[in-house]
């Protein structure tokens, strides 16, 4: 049996006494040392785990971490308790997300628009993007500006900036509220549905890289791409992947699931080591 300490250490986390903290492999797949959303502990022989960032399901955490489920002893009562806590947490986070979205203003004419235009993006900016001042950045404890993107689940994605308009160097992108299965709609068009990871990537595709009108969605992360809920009616789908292993794996997983549901699927991988905003700006791989 794998206990809480084993899982914590396997995820690259820290164990202190009777509790561990580690990166959540679902919503923090980078597993950086500053990422510690997942709390784990053993209590009365029961395994308890909770993701404080996204409220991720522990069974999905186990799967994403590559841990053998047949060696896990999950107590049903503990799992029900974790599920109830996750539901309460998600409701509270969703309320915070809607409040932030409600006070944010349209992105046109803001430092957020200046940032996007500075990255070569020329397409009209969607109503799903707004700009907010004085947004709390948890990892640093500072109050910063943020580009706020509305997710189809009601959650928001935040990209944090200094008051000068420069994007902060670390932990710049964070989600607020339940995002699983959702996406940010960046453009609407009569052509195919195009799914990518990042917001800047999607806007870059809509800035002339596709060669045809399209509906563009940003799934916000590689795990988000894998979990994306597609429209019920199948059609044409272009999966625009980042040029790395995580992007390739996520894109192929989405493509396979879509194909099985009757979608006509095309893969559009970025060059190795690049994303589509790099391509738009004429960058080349090192």
Regions found by a protein language model. Give the residues of each.
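Acidic, metal-coordinating catalytic cores used for nucleic-acid/nucleotide bond scission
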Residues: 223-224, 241-251, 272
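Terminal peptide-recognition signature
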Residues: 24, 51, 116, 149, ...
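A generic structural motif
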Residues: 74, 218-221, 264-274
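Short, surface-exposed amphipathic charged segments that create phosphate/polyanion-binding patches used
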Residues: 230-235, 277-286
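Short, basic/aromatic recognition patches
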Residues: 122-139
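Phosphate-handling DNA/RNA-contact segment within nucleic-acid enzymes
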Residues: 137-232
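Acidic beta-strand-to-loop metal/phosphate-binding motif
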Residues: 195, 235-246, 269
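Non-catalytic accessory segments of DNA primases and related replication-initiation nucleases
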Residues: 1-119, 124, 245-249, 259, ...
